[in-house]
Amino acid sequence: MAFTTPLTAHGYSYQAAYIKAHIAHCDAQRTVVKLTVWPTQADRENGAEPVRYDNDLRQYQTDLNLQADNPVAYAYTLVQASGEFIDATWNV
């Protein structure tokens, strides 16, 4: 599970950055999601190192009523619902 989106990170622009999300912290009040970015999906699949992305943490209010199959799906649902990545292609 991942998404692609145009992204600028550390002075470089990526047309279809490949981004994976996972929960870094979660409690009853907040959920912190860490994003890991590669230039492309092919780079990720070929074992390339992630790009430097200093803006990699997102904090959201924990929604105990939000339905998700697992913690990873919950993280992606929060990121998608935030509206930050409006040009993203989800579930790649």
Protein language model regions, located:
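Viral virion structural and adsorption modules
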Residues: 1-92
